[in-house]
From Swiss-Prot:
It is found in: Cytoplasm. This is Urease accessory protein UreD. Its main location: cytoplasm. Pfam families: UreD (PF01774). GO terms for cellular component: cytoplasm. Keywords: Chaperone, Cytoplasm, Nickel insertion. It comes from Bacillus cereus (strain ATCC 10987 / NRS 248).
Length: 273
């Protein structure tokens, strides 16, 4: 495998009711802020930055995060990630997350924007314990096109595997390939252009909680939203929308609901703009 275009490793632990870094390493195009503490729960907030401006042909990014026992961390990006044209190749990102006993990890980056002739692959592996918590979102949107076409990218290929006590509990593979089939058709994006996934794994998730979440959404007229439970205590939400703002509104509503009803915490503002 070629040398990474950017590397980011974060290792945190709980110390005196506060999450603190043990080791943080970043190299080349990937950078990260110092931990920021925005709430009263000792959670460490990190903002990932890409100094390269966007992903290009042959780029390879590696992000590895370890959340120790009882630690809490929230990780997001500074802004949307842009993937530009990748002729005869693709950009690759690999994510490996390790969540310890009674630990909580929230990974909610801004959307991935796919421009004309872009090809992108993402591989995500997450290793959890029975009483750890995961809140994860992933979203993809088309980039601006001079002729107003929605899908001018080559493909978006994202594979997520979640392991609970070393047992595979979630296998989620999304492949959007507008060069081979129309994404507007029923059963794929159905005339929508923006796609989002929100995954929650937490021991407090029940069928009643999922039912309550379904009825809590507001301003959903221009979207399609589906919720399914996982084989472990958790659920997956799919969102189809026409714009980023509507999709992120649902992400925020889901995030706030999970914080309040699963973690029994308030959701603190983490405004970036």
């Amino acid at each position: 495998m070629k040398s990474p275009t950017g590397v980011l490793n974060i290792d945190v632990m709980e110390k005196r009711d506060k999450t603190v870094p043990i080791k943080v390493y970043h190299k080349d195009a990937l950078k990260v802020t110092q931990p920021i503490y925005l709430d009263k729960y000792g959670r460490a907030y990190y903002y990932i930055m890409n100094s390269g401006g966007g992903y290009l042909k042959g780029d390879f990014y590696s992000i590895n995060i370890n959340v120790g026992k009882d630690a809490k961390t929230y990780i997001t990006s500074q802004s949307a990630t842009k993937v530009y044209k990748t002729p005869n190749s693709y950009a690759l990102q690999e994510l490996n997350f390790y969540i310890g006993q009674n630990a909580a990890m929230e990974y909610l980056p801004d959307p991935l924007i796919m421009y004309k002739d872009a090809a992108y692959k993402q591989k995500t592996n997450i290793y959890m314990q029975n009483n750890s918590t995961l809140i994860l979102c992933d979203s993809v949107t088309p980039g601006w096109s001079p002729n107003m076409e929605k899908f001018t990218y080559q493909y978006f290929d994202s594979l997520t595997k979640i392991y609970m006590e070393n047992k595979l509990v979630v296998y989620d593979h999304l492949l959007l390939n507008p060069f081979k089939e129309s994404l507007d058709q029923m059963g794929i994006l159905n005339q929508y252009s923006h796609y989002g996934t929100f995954i929650v794994i937490n021991e407090n998730v029940t069928n009643d909680l999922i039912a309550a979440l379904k009825t809590s959404f507001s301003n959903t007229n221009n979207m399609k939203i589906g919720i399914a439970s996982t084989t472990c205590k958790g659920f997956v939400i799919r969102i189809l929308s026409h714009n980023t703002e509507d999709m992120e509104s649902i992400f925020f509503q889901c995030h706030r609901f999970v914080r309040e009803n699963c973690l029994h915490e308030e959701l603190t503002s983490y405004r970036k703009y």
